[in-house]
Amino acid sequence: WYRGKFTDYKSVSVKEMKQVKHFLHVEWGGDSHARRHAEDPFKSLGGIPAGVGADERAGDFSLVGGDARASRDGDWSESYIVKLVDWHLKEQETMTWLTGTAYWPFKDFSTPLRPENPVPYVNQKGVIERDFAKKEVFYVFQSYWTQKPMIHIYGHTWPTRWGAANEPKEILVYSNCPAVELFVNGVSQGIKQRNSQDFPAAGLHWKC
């Protein structure tokens, strides 16, 4: 979120893991405006280099100055953060040496330390809002960790998509079910098998 591309997560973690006896990854995540969505959340992130590390440096939290980074240049959309979290969880599934992780934080909260944020004095890294309304990223975690069967189509607060006429749109479904069939206007778009290593949405993604 503050430096590098999230797709470098595992390679960076492996490098750091080799320097310690036990590896616990805490305080990971990123901000997202509830109800802000994007057809291409990566559009403004082309200037961020890959493979150069992910260490946080002084001033990285600021919205001005410094190197290209998602926290400064991104759109803070729910569309971006679900993919960041999905990628981390996908990778953690195969990181058997990982002692544990702690996402930061559970809920958006007020803070005097963020007067410059787009919503002043609010840290928006939570998976739920301050009134406990669930953000989209809540369902990403649920699809990996809950035992009770669940299913959620991304974008319940995004009723109107945009783009060219008849342009195919990405549909993401978060579920812990072994297989999911998607219907659009009563027509089946096919059955897909859940596979945590098939990014995004553990293979439950369609273009239609």
Which residues are covered by each model-predicted region?
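Long, low-complexity serine/threonine/glycine- and acidic-rich segments characteristic of extracellular
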Residues: 151, 180-208
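Short proline/glycine-enriched turn/loop motifs at strand-loop junctions of beta-rich domains
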Residues: 174-179
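Substrate-binding/catalytic cleft of secreted carbohydrate-active enzymes
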Residues: 1-133, 137, 141, 148-162, ...
